[in-house]
């Protein structure tokens, strides 16, 4: 297998995408944060002392998508044309499901931006609720869809 992020000397490099065609690209990532029922109820009711947990997590996820290249060394800075973070409060399983949809028109995909958005949104929920629930678990972060570019459509069965 040929690793594109390794140069001839075996050192890390950023892949040159200058010859790639610009195409419309989209990536969708999901993840979950499990918590106590009481924590989920308080998020839903808006009674967490630090504020509106989901509003802050939504903004944090968007900011994270926009700043992915600052956190992951080999990611290209990308002009994101759209980013949407959504939440589903699952009271039966005592968790919040997080979904990020990131779009661009460019020479490289936005998979890492979508994954980073979900991760940081989950971390923000953890941060805002840790005073009442240190048993929260962030898990199941994965790419579920990618479209555009040479490799075309990828969809994970979930």
Curated annotation (Swiss-Prot):
It holds the Pfam family MoaC. It catalyses: (8S)-3',8-cyclo-7,8-dihydroguanosine 5'-triphosphate = cyclic pyranopterin phosphate + diphosphate. Its EC number is 4.6.1.17. GO terms for molecular function: cyclic pyranopterin monophosphate synthase activity. Keywords: Lyase, Molybdenum cofactor biosynthesis. Catalyzes the conversion of (8S)-3',8-cyclo-7,8-dihydroguanosine 5'-triphosphate to cyclic pyranopterin monophosphate (cPMP). This is Cyclic pyranopterin monophosphate synthase. It comes from Thermoanaerobacter pseudethanolicus (strain ATCC 33223 / 39E).
């Amino acid at each position: 297998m040929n690793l594109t992020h390794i140069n001839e000397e075996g050192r890390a490099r950023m892949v040159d995408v200058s010859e790639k065609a610009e195409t419309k690209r989209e990536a969708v990532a999901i993840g979950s944060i499990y918590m106590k029922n009481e924590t989920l109820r308080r998020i839903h009711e808006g009674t967490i002392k630090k504020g509106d947990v989901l509003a802050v997590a939504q903004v944090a996820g968007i900011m994270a998508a926009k700043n992915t290249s600052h956190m992951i060394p080999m990611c290209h800075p990308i002009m994101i044309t759209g980013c949407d973070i959504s939440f589903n409060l699952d009271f039966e399983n005592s968790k919040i499901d997080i979904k990020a949809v990131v779009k661009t028109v460019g020479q490289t995909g936005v998979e890492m931006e979508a994954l980073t958005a979900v991760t940081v949104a989950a971390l923000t929920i953890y941060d805002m609720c840790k005073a009442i629930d240190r048993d929260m678990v962030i898990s199941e972060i994965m790419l579920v869809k990618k479209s555009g570019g040479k490799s075309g459509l990828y969809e994970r069965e979930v």
